[in-house]
Every structure is written in structure tokens, then in C-alpha cells.
Amino acid sequence: MKKRNRLKKNEDFQKVFKRGTSMANRQFVLYTLDQPKQEELRVGLSVSKKIGNAVVRNRVKRLIRQAVQEEKELLKPKDFIIIARKPAGDLSFEETKKSLQHLFRKTSLYKKSSSK
């Protein structure tokens, strides 16, 4: 994912947490914040130490990034934060992508022309 598509600063995370809306399923929590003047989506990731050691946490982050990258063109330009829950450590890529697509649909993150 390119730098301009990442949320890194604590103030950006706090803004999304305070002003945004959240939706969750078993594996992930998704916080979204609409930014009217923004042209591209920005993603922040949070993977707790409860999920496993560094190898497992980094694998989960890679899977999430890849799933978002594949869906990027279909998503609205918003800020969102994905927080991985404990079951996310055991998911394959296909399961991760399916779980995230479910959250994207529930929060209406897909653009109107999408057939999702």
C-alpha cells in the first residue's frame, strides 16, 4: 500500500475513533470516517499482541493490506481503521478477504457502481 493510503499519526487515529462510526464481526472491527475533500482512501491497522507473536501479527497485517489493496478501486475515499481480533490470527487470505468484504458491505464502503 502506498504511503498516501496509510493512516500513521496518532491524531489521525484518534479523529477516526472519536468522530467515526464502527462496525464489527468476529475477526475485525472497522472504524470509518467520511472526509469530504479526500480523493483516496486511507487505512490504519491495529493488531494486538493477544493475537500472537510478531510473526503472526505481521502475517495478519500483510493479509489485511493485500485484501484492501484488491478491493481499493471499489471502495469510497474515506479514512478507516481495521482492528484485528484474536480469531484473525488463524485465517487464510481468502477468509480474511471475505470477512473484510462483509464489513465493507455492512458499512456501505463500496462505491455505488460496485456489484458487491
UniProtKB/Swiss-Prot annotation:
Statement: the UniProt record of this protein carries the keyword RNA-binding: yes
GO term, biological process aspect, one: tRNA 5'-leader removal
Pfam families, per the entry: Ribonuclease_P
InterPro entries reported in the protein's UniProt record: Ribosomal_Su5_D2-typ_SF, Ribsml_uS5_D2-typ_fold_subgr, RNase_P, RNase_P_CS
Catalytic activity line of the entry: Endonucleolytic cleavage of RNA, removing 5'-extranucleotides from tRNA precursor
Residues annotated as signal peptide: none
GO molecular function (one): tRNA binding
Enzyme category, top tier: hydrolase
The EC number(s) this enzyme carries: 3.1.26.5
One GO cellular component, as annotated: ribonuclease P complex
Keyword set, alphabetical order: Endonuclease, Hydrolase, Nuclease, RNA-binding, tRNA processing
Keyword Magnesium included in the entry's annotation: no
Family the UniProt entry places it in: Belongs to the RnpA family.
Functional note: RNaseP catalyzes the removal of the 5'-leader sequence from pre-tRNA to produce the mature 5'-terminus. It can also cleave other RNA substrates such as 4.5S RNA. The protein component plays an auxiliary but essential role in vivo by binding to the 5'-leader sequence and broadening the substrate specificity of the ribozyme.
Subunit and interaction comment: Consists of a catalytic RNA component (M1 or rnpB) and a protein subunit.
Family matches, as NCBIfam families: rnpA
Name of the protein described by the UniProt record: Ribonuclease P protein component
Species for this entry: Bacillus velezensis (strain DSM 23117 / BGSC 10A6 / LMG 26770 / FZB42)
